[in-house]
Design a protein with these regions (language model features):
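Catalytic pocket-lining loop regions of alpha/beta-barrel enzymes
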Residues: 3, 137-145, 150, 154-156, ...
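Aromatic- and glycine-enriched glycan-recognition loops and surfaces
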Residues: 81-89, 125-131, 182-192
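Short aromatic-enriched loop/helix-cap "lid" or pocket-rim segments at secondary-structure transitions
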Residues: 32-35, 117, 216-220, 271-275, ...
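Short, glycine/acidic-enriched loop or turn micro-motifs at the edges of active sites
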Residues: 25-27, 210, 266, 338
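Active-site flanking residues adjacent to catalytic metal/cofactor-binding acidic residues
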Residues: 21-23, 206, 262, 333-334
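Divalent metal-dependent hydrolysis catalytic cores, especially in the metallo-beta-lactamase
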Residues: 74-81, 92-116, 143-151, 172-176
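N-terminal-biased segments
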Residues: 27-28, 38-49, 124-125, 141-159
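Mid-to-C-terminal alpha-helical segments outside catalytic/metal-binding sites
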Residues: 2-21, 32-102, 131, 135, ...
Length: 378
């Protein structure tokens, strides 16, 4: 059933004359929704669980938090699962309430795609999601733009999917899942994905989520609260993957590839730049293929704001962005409709200049995605 966004979400006219591009919006792909789009025999697995209540954690192998029964993931909790968007009409209505002009769509369940244990099943689900997304959700006319899911288990198949959808007018990039990922994205195993994305001039976006999983950096079972796990999981995952990509030469091997990261906040980036530069000065013999300091490559990474830090003095966010030279690479993201989404009005309170605010709220995303203000590919 189509729902209307709660009235308290409505913004003022602050963004009335400003383009707002939300680079992290989540659709909800249930097993029943994906089943008709899934190849046999894996369609049977989805059909068998299609009529189960939407409780997430009792869906075997579809989107478990872990692959080892001795670990348990807490995502999503009942609170998180209480807010979903079921149709593009509902999504458009609610994004209008938030003054969002263009929304970049990520999945829900498939945030955890890497933890699936069966390669063929994972690839089939990724292909089904891509078909479902373009059929049911994406619409440049409605300002809803899609990302091609890259199956981490089968990079060759993922490269074929990128080639298949590269010219689709509504598919503007490639989603790289990070939750429970092993090996990290710097591994040469994934080169076919990066080669395809660079060839077709599509940006890639890394997105993580909280899971407890026996691979670095998700082996966070030492924590006993979700507060602790959520504090570290998203950000540590993104940091680890970027370090791996820099030190294995991903950025030098694919110099025209645009890379973005989502749902990790922004305050860690200055530290990572400084720390990597220090280590580089002492251990550059490990990475003779790097022609510049690590910070040179990290400054090219586009970074989505959600979940934005909330210091007592919001001017500190301006200073943080200056430290990583992020005026032209920071992109607004809300994480709508998840319970911890960031309202656009929060950014009206941060003392950015009008020029910087316009860049962060929309202009940087247009350049990253290579689209115009209507969502049309350039």
């Amino acid at each position: 059933m189509t729902q209307v966004a709660p009235s308290h979400l409505q913004t003022s006219n602050v963004f009335e004359d400003m383009l707002v591009v939300d680079t992290d919006v989540h659709v909800h792909e249930s097993p029943g929704e994906l089943a008709p789009y899934c190849d046999m025999p894996w369609r049977v697995a989805l059909e068998n669980i299609a009529d189960r209540p939407e409780t997430y954690l009792d869906i075997p192998s579809f989107s478990p938090g872990v692959s080892d029964g001795s670990y348990q993931a807490k995502f999503p909790t009942a609170h998180e699962g209480a807010r979903m968007v079921w149709t593009k009409e509902q999504m458009r209505t609610e994004l209008n309430q938030l003054d969002v002009d263009l929304g970049l769509l990520f999945p829900d369940h498939l945030l955890k795609l890497p933890v699936l244990t069966q390669t063929e099943y994972a690839a089939a689900i990724a292909r089904a999601y891509n078909r479902w997304l373009v059929d049911k959700w994406t619409s440049q006319k409605d300002g809803l733009l899609g990302l091609i899911v890259a199956c981490t288990h089968d990079p060759q198949d993922a490269a074929k999917e990128i080639a298949k959808y590269a010219d689709h007018p509504d598919m503007v990039g490639v989603y790289l899942p990070c939750a429970g990922l092993d090996p990290l994205w710097g591994n040469p195993k994934y080169h076919p994905i990066f080669e395809a994305a660079q060839y077709h001039e599509l940006p890639v976006l890394l997105h993580s989520v909280t899971v407890t999983h026996p691979v670095f950096p998700f082996n966070n079972h030492g924590f006993d609260t979700e507060l602790a796990r959520h504090t570290t999981s998203h950000t540590f995952s993104i940091m680890s993957n970027l370090v791996d990509m820099v030190t294995r030469g991903t950025f030098t091997r694919f110099p025209r590839l645009k890379v973005g990261v989502s749902e990790a906040g922004i305050s860690w980036m200055p530290w990572l730049m400084m720390r990597m530069d220090k280590e580089y000065l002492e251990r550059r013999r490990d990475v003779p293929f790097l022609r510049e300091k690590p910070s040179h490559y990290l400054k090219k990474v586009y970074i989505c704001t959600q979940p934005i830090e909330e210091p007592d003095d919001l001017a500190d966010l301006v200073k943080v962005m200056e430290l990583y030279d992020g005026e032209d690479t920071t992109m607004f993201a809300s994480d709508w409709p998840h319970h911890d989404f960031d309202h656009p009005m929060k950014f009206a309170q941060v003392p950015f200049t009008d020029e910087v605010r316009r860049k962060v709220m929309g202009e940087n995303a247009l350049r990253f995605l290579n689209i115009d203000s209507t969502g049309r590919k350039l």
